[in-house]
Swiss-Prot record:
<protein>
    <recommendedName>
        <fullName>ATP phosphoribosyltransferase regulatory subunit</fullName>
    </recommendedName>
</protein>
<comment type="function">
    <text>Required for the first step of histidine biosynthesis. May allow the feedback regulation of ATP phosphoribosyltransferase activity by histidine.</text>
</comment>
<dbReference type="Pfam" id="PF13393">
    <property type="entry name" value="tRNA-synt_His"/>
</dbReference>
<dbReference type="InterPro" id="IPR041715">
    <property type="entry name" value="HisRS-like_core"/>
</dbReference>
<comment type="pathway">
    <text>Amino-acid biosynthesis; L-histidine biosynthesis; L-histidine from 5-phospho-alpha-D-ribose 1-diphosphate: step 1/9.</text>
</comment>
<dbReference type="GO" id="GO:0005737">
    <property type="term" value="C:cytoplasm"/>
</dbReference>
<keyword id="KW-0028">Amino-acid biosynthesis</keyword>
<dbReference type="GO" id="GO:0000105">
    <property type="term" value="P:L-histidine biosynthetic process"/>
</dbReference>
<dbReference type="InterPro" id="IPR004516">
    <property type="entry name" value="HisRS/HisZ"/>
</dbReference>
<keyword id="KW-0368">Histidine biosynthesis</keyword>
<dbReference type="InterPro" id="IPR004517">
    <property type="entry name" value="HisZ"/>
</dbReference>
<comment type="similarity">
    <text>Belongs to the class-II aminoacyl-tRNA synthetase family. HisZ subfamily.</text>
</comment>
<dbReference type="GO" id="GO:0004821">
    <property type="term" value="F:histidine-tRNA ligase activity"/>
</dbReference>
<keyword id="KW-0963">Cytoplasm</keyword>
<comment type="subunit">
    <text>Heteromultimer composed of HisG and HisZ subunits.</text>
</comment>
<dbReference type="GO" id="GO:0006427">
    <property type="term" value="P:histidyl-tRNA aminoacylation"/>
</dbReference>
<dbReference type="InterPro" id="IPR045864">
    <property type="entry name" value="aa-tRNA-synth_II/BPL/LPL"/>
</dbReference>
């Protein structure tokens, strides 16, 4: 037991830390250029906060021992925690709030999947107290900027609309509606066909819903014929305007697939929902996900006052995997700029002084001192293996002999 980390967790060694740090640093730089400020919330939250008023399944939360104040757990995502903080701690600040984060999250695996990963690393943004077309477009264009800055290969955004999908599902009786919804979420056409529909009209409508994915213009033309409610027609028009805005901002078509069967894991989404995927070397990976949640903030308001919000989270592990075969990630942990070697016990003070001088002269330099026990040949072999750039041999009188490798 003591030789391995707990099931579902893993250690990150220096090269992987360097590469994922490179990804995170570039993402945070993009976030800041778009005006987002970093927020840090607690890893441990009240279970009521994490389940976001019933929107998140409590079974996905790794719960901790409760006390007299209630149950707590490890956050399975950041949106609920940031929404709580924004409503309760930042209510006096001007709106909108543009917040970003980089953090780990924890999710309990499903029954029968012991050993599955439980700790994940994410980076993302939340645009709070602002609704409408421009906010939706900002989030999607920011997401695209993130992928462009990392040179992610073959990425696409799959876009749905939670409110529109709910409207299209409304003709189905309640028990059947949930079954249809599940089949759509799992892309399970066989089960969808075999559901007990009360009439052939609903069966045909379920088939149409299943196939509402593809080129945005084509899908919007199909769904316009199905959208009977006024709210659904409004959602269709908003999607048309959003697609036009996204395409107008880029030199070529925005890499977008419209999929009205897209249903996210977290049920607090009320407007657009989306997943970002990369099809690299015939492996489809989910790089990120997000959407609009215009009711979630009200869960944390003392009077239940709702406010709009939208955001996304990026999966650092999947981004890392998608970039490994390319040329952008660092291929090694940052090497030392200088290795200082004291030549004798009486040279130790002079060596520390030389190291301090180098660090003070350039705060970005990486400087270490050889701790002894190796011959000159062994030191040079070590330096070459570690790609150390410079050696400095320090004499007892403080004189230094430098060499570049």
């Amino acid at each position: 037991m003591i030789h391995q980390p707990p099931a579902g967790t893993r250690d990150l060694l220096p090269l992987e830390v360097t590469q994922k740090g490179w990804i995170n640093d570039r993402l945070q730089s993009v976030f800041q250029r778009w005006g987002y400020q970093r927020i840090v919330t607690s890893t441990i939250e009240w279970l009521d906060t994490l389940t976001a008023g019933g929107a998140i399944d409590p079974s996905t939360v790794i719960q901790l021992h409760g006390d007299s104040q209630g149950l707590s757990g490890l956050r399975p995502e950041l949106t609920a925690s940031i929404a709580r903080s924004a409503v309760t701690r930042m209510s006096g600040e001007s709106y909108p709030q543009r917040l970003c984060y980089r953090a780990n999250v924890f999710r309990r695996p499903s029954a029968g999947y012991h050993g599955r990963q439980v700790e994940f690393y994410q980076a993302g943004v939340e645009l709070l107290f602002s609704g409408g077309l421009l906010a939706d477009a900002e989030i999607l264009l920011l997401l695209a900027d993130c992928f462009d800055s990392l040179a992610v290969p073959n990425w696409q955004i799959i876009l749905g609309e939670a409110g529109l999908t709910r409207s299209l599902l409304s003709p189905f009786p309640a028990p059947l509606r949930e079954q249809v919804k599940r089949c759509l979420a799992l892309l399970d056409y066989v089960s969808l066909e075999n559901l007990p529909y009360p009439n052939e009209t609903l069966r045909q409508q379920a088939r149409q819903l299943f196939h509402l994915r593809g080129n945005p213009e084509d899908v919007l033309a199909q769904v316009a014929l199905l959208a009977q409610e006024e709210s659904a027609q409004k959602a269709v028009n908003n999607l048309k305007s959003l697609v036009e805005l996204l395409n107008a901002d880029r030199s070529g078509p925005f890499p977008l697939i419209l999929d009205l069967s897209l249903i996210q894991t977290f049920d607090y989404y009320t407007g657009i929902v989306f997943k970002a995927v990369s099809d690299h070397q015939q492996n489809l990976s989910i790089l990120g996900q997000g959407g609009r949640y215009d009711q979630l903030l009200g869960v944390f308001h003392p009077q239940g006052q709702s406010a709009p919000g939208i955001g996304f989270s990026l999966n650092i592990e999947e981004l890392h995997e998608s970039l490994l075969s390319g040329q952008t990630l660092p291929t090694q942990a940052a090497p030392l700029d200088w290795l200082l070697i004291p030549l004798g016990n009486n040279a130790q003070i002079a060596t520390f002084s030389k190291a301090r001088s180098l660090r003070n002269g350039d705060p970005n330099l990486r400087v270490a001192i050889d701790l002894g026990g190796r011959s000159e040949a062994q030191i040079r072999t070590y330096a070459r293996d570690r790609m150390i750039k410079n050696l400095a041999w320090v004499q007892e009188d403080g004189s230094v002999s430098e060499e570049s490798l």
